[in-house]
Every structure is written in structure tokens, then in C-alpha cells.
Amino acid sequence: LTKSEEIADFPSNEVKIYLCGPTVQSPPHIGHGRSAVVFDFLFRYLKYLGKEIIVARNITDIDDKIIEKSLEQGVTYSELTKNVSKEFIQAYAALNCLKPTYEPKATESIDEIIDFIKILEEKDIAYQTSSGVYFDITRYSKYLELSGRSIEDLLSGTRVEFIEGKKNNEDFALWKLAKENEPSWKSPWGQGRPGWHICLLYTSPSPRDFTE
């Protein structure tokens, strides 16, 4: 983006906002509170301008950290995430934050996530390895558009741990194949779970509204 054009207004009265929600492996901290308050200010300001606000804030309730934490505490991942999710809801309420229009969980959107990964595979943007399915960042020209960086710069400075089969070290997991005794769901690629970066796909009953 050039930062040379002033964005005067939204093209329609309806404003759709996606907010990356919490990964619920531990209680909320001040960073979560800051994010909630900043976006709550934005929501209220847009409502003041007369805009119809549609807000999607996901809850990531399956993740490597969640699995690790549940094993540490000797509880199931679902018990852990249920309790921590309640703490987040209570924290948002204590901060007097407006509730989002949609607040779905990863585990409630497995079918939608799988369908979208299939589409990315068909477009040759996603590929399978022995550990899961990954997003090829070199196949999407707008991947770093907001950061102002280039793919070449990103790859030249990468410090991500190498995973066998990945085309680029910075490619991220869309679907992770499950290890022994890990929670998992059936998929065309084998038993596994969604990758952390796929969270946008479970933002609403119509995820495409937020992925266009």
C-alpha cells in the first residue's frame, strides 16, 4: 500500500470487521485487554457514525499450546478451553466491551476449514507434506502487502525451524496431522487438526464474507 491516498469513507453503510480472537490455553492478560479496548473504541465510533457493524472474533480452542497445557494440568483440551473461554468472556464484560456479532470456535468449524483448504489445494496455493498441509506464501502475491515487505526479504531473513517437506521455511500450517493420543478430526489428508493461521475461516456462518 502506498499510504498516499486518503480513505474518506467506507463504500457502503455495512462495515465488516474481523478480529483475531484469543487462543484459550491460559487466562487473559493485559495484552488481551488492550486489544479488546482498542477495537471496542473502533466499533463504538463506527456505530456513532451510523454504520452497521458486523464483527467476527474467533476463539481458537485447539492448538499446540492448548494440548501442552491440558497435559500439564491433567485435563482434556475441551475442559481446559471451556473454562478459559469463560474467563475471557468475563474479562470482556468487565471492560464493558461490546459483544461481537459472531464468536465461533475452531472445533465448531472443521468442515468449513477442510473445504477451504481443498480450494487452496486446487489453486496450487496449498500443498501436503508428511506432517500436514501448508500454505505456499510464494503463490499469493498480496501476502505481505500490508507490511510493505517482499517475499524475497522475508525468506532471506527467515529463522523458522526447518520442517521436512516444506517448500519455504515461512510457509505455515493449514492442517496439522495428529500425533499419538492428540485430539484430531478426520480429513482427506489424515487425522489432524486446523493450523493456527486458518482462524479467519470460522468467523461467521458465511466465512467467505470475511475472506473476500
Language-model-derived ranges and their functions:
Residues 130:
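Nucleotide/pyrophosphate-binding catalytic subdomain
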Residues 1-127, 144, 152, 158, ...:
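N-terminal Rossmann-like or analogous alpha/beta NTP/dinucleotide-binding catalytic cores
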Residues 96-100, 185, 208:
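Short, surface-exposed connector motifs at secondary-structure boundaries
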Residues 60, 138, 178:
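Anionic group-transfer/hydrolysis microenvironments
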Residues 19-23, 179, 208:
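Short, histidine-centered active-site or binding-site loop motifs used for metal coordination
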Residues 1-2, 141-191, 198-201:
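NTP-handling and nucleic-acid-processing catalytic cores
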Residues 202-212:
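Single conserved hydrophobic/aromatic residue that forms the stacking wall/gate
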Residues 133-136:
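Minor-groove-contacting beta-hairpin "wing" of winged helix-turn-helix DNA-binding domains
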